[in-house]
Amino acid sequence: RSVFPLDIIKLTVPDLYVTIVHPQIEVRTADARSILKQQILLKDAIKQWGNIAGLVAGLEQGNYELIGRSLEDVLIEPTRSILIPAFDQVKKISKELGALGGGISGSGPSIFMLSTNEFTAKSVEIAMGQIYDSIGLSCHTYVTTINTNGIQLMDAS
């Protein structure tokens, strides 16, 4: 199946909060791409496709447990995470605080975590900031909800 034409499908997304931390480092997309494996094992591909299907189904069904189980990237994250200081610590602490899961946003260095409520999302935000403070790296953190409207043209005036 080709991605041309691109199919754009609107998902029904449950109320989720997104916590994002952006460490003040540069990760060039070209560098992040250059370290990826050119070939993957079939067992890893099968697991990744299952996780993607589980994530889409979990979002559509509002099944938080399935969303959490499916937020595992076995192809890209293990390699790219080495470019992001404290990545593993941020992910571990966030899940301990109740986040469903998360991962690398784009090629990095931003990390996102999904939570079912604002209290958890804010707790994750505080912990993310503390982790980067403890290693002497500035960061910006954000808590928001998922935009279900998609791209919109805004008046610049």
Regions found by a protein language model. Give the residues of each.
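ATP-dependent small-molecule kinase catalytic core of the GHMP/sugar-kinase superfamily
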Residues: R1-L97, E118-S157
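Short acidic/polar active-site loop segments enriched in Thr and Asp
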Residues: L100
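Glycine-centered loop/turn positions within well-structured domains
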Residues: P109-I111, N149
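Short hydrophobic/aromatic beta-strand micro-patches
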Residues: F112-T116
